[in-house]
Every structure is written in structure tokens, then in C-alpha cells.
From Swiss-Prot:
This is Cuticle protein 8. One of its GO terms (molecular function) is structural constituent of cuticle. The keyword Repeat applies. The tetrapeptide (A-A-P-[AV]) repeats found throughout the protein are also present in many proteins constituting the protective envelope of other species. Keywords: Cuticle, Repeat. Pfam families: Chitin_bind_4. The lineage of its organism: Eukaryota, Metazoa, Ecdysozoa, Arthropoda, Hexapoda. Sequence repeats lie at residues 16-19, 22, 28-31, 37-40, 44-47. GO terms for cellular component: extracellular matrix; extracellular space. Residues 58-128 form the Chitin-binding type R&R domain. Component of the cuticle of migratory locust which contains more than 100 different structural proteins. InterPro entries: CHIT_BIND_RR_consensus (IPR031311), Insect_cuticle (IPR000618), Insect_Cuticle_Struc_Prot (IPR051217).
Length: 148
């Protein structure tokens, strides 16, 4: 027995999965053919661009500064001068033991960086303020021991 779609039904009167289905007919869109020509290659003459060279200033400077804080004991100074490719300078600072460390340096293209360190003993050590540390008391409470 066949149903309205042509599927074979079993004589038992029940329904079963169809034996096979045919795929619908597929339709394809028409293919459009395009004729593309190769792009035309054109070469242009290079454009000459005028570049203005900025003048390079001659490197020359000089600076110095100093700090003298008696409260913290921060005592230092520095000075430096540059003339062309030669840099000369020095800095000094007071060490915690009261001595003064002075560094004199020079740097140039021929000799590189060179430094000489001098140490001058201090007349008296710089007193550093002691740090006061106070701890809060720890509260301890013992739990009572209970026997059953």
C-alpha cells in the first residue's frame, strides 16, 4: 500500500519511516563571465624633495647646585660643564660618618669616562636621629578550663 507521497506502507496498518527520499532538484544561478584586462602599469619619474638641514647647535652648558639640610643631614653639591664633546664635573656629599666624598670626573670621545674619588675625614660625625619604636601591649585572656 502506498500513501499520497508514494511511500510504501506496511500492511500492518502502522506507520514506519519511509524507505528512501529523493533529494530535490537543485538549481544553480547562471554564471556570469567577466573579462578583466590586466592593469596598465605606468612608471612616474621620481619626485625630488628638497630637505633643509637644520643647523646643529654647538653643545655647551654649565650648571651647579647644592643642598644643605641640617635636619636630615643631607649635604651635597654638584657642578658640571660641557664644551663640545668634553664634559667635566664634580659632586660631593657628606657620608653618615661625617666624612666628605668628592668625585671629580671628565668624559670625552678620546679617553672615555674617567673619575677620581677623594675622601676627606669629617670633623665630627653627623648625628642621625634615633627611630623611636613603641609597641602596643598585647592583651592575653585565658579561657577557663571546664571538666565534665
Amino acid at each position: 500500500i502506498e500513501d499520497e507521497y508514494g511511500n510504501v506502507l506496511h500492511a500492518s496498518g502502522g506507520y514506519a519511516a519511509p524507505a528512501a527520499y529523493a533529494a530535490p532538484v537543485a538549481y544553480a544561478a547562471p554564471v556570469a563571465k567577466a573579462v578583466v584586462a590586466a592593469p596598465a602599469v605606468a612608471y612616474a619619474a621620481p619626485v625630488a624633495k628638497a630637505v633643509v638641514a637644520e643647523p646643529v647647535a654647538y653643545p655647551k652648558y654649565e650648571f651647579n647646585y647644592g643642598v644643605h639640610d641640617a635636619h636630615t643631614g643631607d649635604i651635597k653639591q654638584q657642578s658640571e660643564a660641557r664644551d663640545g664633546d668634553v664634559v667635566k664635573g664634580s659632586y660631593s656629599l657628606v657620608e653618615p660618618d661625617g666624612s666628605t666624598r668628592t668625585v671629580e670626573y671628565q668624559a670625552d670621545d678620546h679617553n672615555g669616562f674617567n673619575a677620581v674619588v677623594h675622601r676627606t675625614p669629617g670633623t665630627h660625625p653627623v648625628a642621625v636621629a634615633p627611630v623611636a619604636v613603641a609597641h602596643a601591649p598585647v592583651a592575653v585572656a585565658h579561657a577557663p578550663i571546664a571538666y565534665h
